[in-house]
Regions:
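Histidine-centered active-site/metal-ligand motif
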Residues: 44, 58, 186
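Conserved small/polar residues in nucleotide/adenosyl-binding loops
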Residues: 1-5, 185-187
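Short, structured beta-strand-loop surface elements
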Residues: 61-127
Length: 187
């Protein structure tokens, strides 16, 4: 079930699964939101889609969220692509009609699901390895850093100081507000 928590006209709704997965992969830093004791908690965490069923990530052990909320807590992960202010002065017909107002163009994906934390070394290695491999391929190519490049005792200490987690995906909604509701002369 997807709770409509934002204005989403049909012409801005994005239902292309590949495009949604592409946006999440290109802009992996999510705002991860939950409610604890009536207060909203937000963390900015890089996440990765693991197929279409789950998001994976990790937090610092010092981040108290894994102690504050229980496994199964509902989470909202918000992924935002690039965005921009759009001035009325940029429309070619503005000098003639003056029928334009400012707007903001953006793309966003909301993924809801339930979180499960893990302190197991196997899960931490899988999450850190997957996220690292994905990002290193994008930025370093053939010279990609691998976890095995670091001394084992150092990696062990780093892994001891994180908590892995998975968010089982319940729903996905995406919005691409890119002025596609305007005539072609304006975009």
């Amino acid at each position: 079930m997807c709770i409509r928590d934002r204005y989403l006209p049909a012409h801005f709704e994005d239902t292309d699964g590949d495009a949604i997965a592409g946006l999440v992969a290109a802009f992996p830093l999510a705002t991860l939101v939950c409610v604890h004791d009536g207060e909203m908690i937000a963390n900015h965490i890089p996440l990765m889609m693991n197929g279409s069923e789950e998001l994976v990530g990790h937090i610092a052990l010092a981040n108290a969220i894994h102690e504050l909320i229980d496994d199964g807590t509902r989470m909202l992960a918000i992924f935002s692509a690039e965005d921009s202010y759009i001035s009325p002065n940029w429309y070619p017909t503005k000098p003639v009609t003056h029928r334009h107002v400012p707007t903001w163009n953006y793309q966003v994906v909301h993924i809801r699901g339930r979180i499960t934390f893990s302190h197991s070394r196997k899960d931490k290695l899988a999450v850190v390895g997957g996220l690292t491999k994905l990002q290193e391929q994008k930025f370093s190519g053939d010279r990609a850093w691998k976890m095995s490049d670091a001394p084992r005792d150092y990696m062990d200490r780093m892994l001891d100081n994180i908590v892995a987690f998975r968010i089982g995906i319940d729903s996905i909604s995406a919005k691409s507000k890119l002025s596609q509701n305007l005539s072609l002369i304006h975009i």
